Amino acid sequence: GAHTALVFPSLLCKVETVGESLKDKDLAAFLDCCLHRYILPTLDNRAEAEAFAKAVLERFANPYIHHRWQSIALNSISKYTARVLPTLLDTVAGGAPVPRPLAFSLACLIEYYKTRPVTDDPKQTAFIKENPIPAILANAELWGTDLSFLTDTVTICTEKLHQSGVREAMQWSM
């Protein structure tokens, strides 16, 4: 879920590759927050989780691999649903509040889909472009479940994006 959580904040910051994101203090802090506060705690074996995180960060930092965010962004609705949403849902099911960094990542995905050309299912893309956040989140066909409970948080994240810019909104989300 680390790639998926970071892709749209990075693209909205006009950062083109994964390696560049790791060198960017704001994006690196966001990734660290997502990984260590939300993704890793949902994995069963703590030692395996830490080894996984280390391997992910090493792969992301490899200067010989130029993972372009535009390529990673392909089909992001299904990727978010499979890779980030389970962590978000597990966190909330455990009684914790909505994890703002993961909701911010979703707000960035929606903002990107609304404002830029994307390569994804044309029907899904059109639905996002044409509808407000509450309708987008309530659409179980997009996310596999009704995400209406995220409306307030994602709306606030989006307002922060518009009012303060990506970096300040990202800092707020952490």
Locate each region found by the language model.
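Non-transmembrane, aqueous-exposed alpha-helical and coiled segments at domain scale
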Residues: 1-174
